[in-house]
Amino acid sequence: MRQDIRFLLNGQPQRVSHAAGDLTLLGWLREQPHLRGTKQGCGEGDCGACTVALGRPDESGQLVWSPINACILFLPMVDGAAIRTVDGLAAADGQLHPVQAAMVAADAAQCGFCTPGFVMSLYVAWQNRDGLGQDSIDDTLAGNLCRCTGYRAIVSAALALAAPDVHSPADRSDAAEAAALAALCAAGDHDDDLVVDQGATSFYAPTTPAAFADFYAENPDSVIVAGATDVGLWVTKQHRTLGQMLWTGRVPQFDRVVRDDDRLFIGPAVTHQRFADAIAADLPELAELMRRFAAQQVRSSGTICGNIANASPIGDLPPALIALGSAVELTRLGAVRQLALEDFFIAYGQQDRAAGEFVSGIYMPAQPAPHLRCYKISKRFDQDISAVMLAANVDIVDGVITAPRLAFGGMAAIPKRAAAAEAALIGKPVEMTTFQQAAVALADDFTPLSDMRGSAAYRMATAQNLLVKYGLDLSEGQKFRLAGAGLASVMERW
């Protein structure tokens, strides 16, 4: 076993041998190398002030960069990666990086606290040659908040960076960094299991499925960590001592998206962003939900199976996967079983999962679902928890509804299908009266609660309206969307 965390920081090799398993990347950056350009804002992966760039090599050895929230990512999770912070962008002679220069030219900083995070999100887009246009800049910056509301100047800087003649591809070369990372990872023991056990919390990162399953069967109270977008908050906001953590991220077989004739398998380490890319062509409706589900920082770290395993009453993704007829795979040692995803959720905080058993994958249909619609109602358009979520899917044969699947989030203690409303749709024509009658039946399916995101009456009325909206989508042959114009589009009119 290996006990040192190895990564690149602004191009320089790092080996960290003495660290607590639950030390965050942000905590280490600010206290050890004293790189304090990266800021702590919310401490929960929401504001983006802590954004840094994380690069991992693709199959060709080139680095692919992602923005991540350093405030909730545990330091051992950057093992084998390249990290770049705002402190490392300028050249040794002090010349600003093109992203920094564009921000200065656009007067895009006010109080300046959020500026490093915005710079790093734009840096990732600049490195990847994607996400700086008018049609994509909103998504690029959705995970960064500016309390001074200086967004217009920041967007202007981004659009300036998108000009094709501003910077040559040579400016973006990170071949030397990729080579340095490859050399760091070439040590004979690099592929050994990683153990970080300083302090009260230890962090174990096995490299094979068998080692992972064996450890969890022997230590069923371990906290499984995938992207830390949920577990990270247990440390930063709830101040919990986690004891033993078990990470999925160093098992290559866990990071798989496998397509066969009629099903798609999603492994336990597959991120939201990779999943969205894999299903975009066949399931554009679901891909659009993924864009609203979370900003790029969270999509780049959080995983599909982690979202299922934490069993949120809303979750956004579980209703959509239930509407598609997906199944969850559970593993304990050599025993593997599958069950329908809606049967996995039993009650609030309770799933059909035995001690030592973990979510080892999701199976979902691989073919397009032309009648799938996903409706997310939240106070913010991007990166917000839903008040009500509806994922609806039906088959239509000769104008008649068959096999309806209506799955709601935010209406019960678990993501749940609406059995009475589904029964009201079966065998009925695709017309508005059908869906109006089904909407009335929702009162037999749910007794929602009131909380800070909405009253019980609001949730019921919204759920009924969403089902009628689905009927409009199908019967009128057009889509009705609650979509914002976007910052770049608004700027065109100013």
Show where each model-derived region lies.
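Short Cys/His-rich Zn2+-coordinating modules
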Residues: 30-35, 95-96, 128-131
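Short, surface-exposed linear segments at secondary-structure transitions and domain or protein termini
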Residues: 23-28, 74-82, 346-354, 382-384
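C-terminal structural segment of proteins
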Residues: 8, 13, 53-57, 63-69, ...
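Short structural boundary motif marking the start of a folded domain
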Residues: 1-7
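Short, contiguous acidic and Ser/Thr-rich linear segments
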Residues: 12-21
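Helix-adjacent hinge/juxtasegments
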Residues: 52-89
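A basic, amphipathic helix-loop patch mediating RNA/tRNA/ribosome contacts
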Residues: 20-52
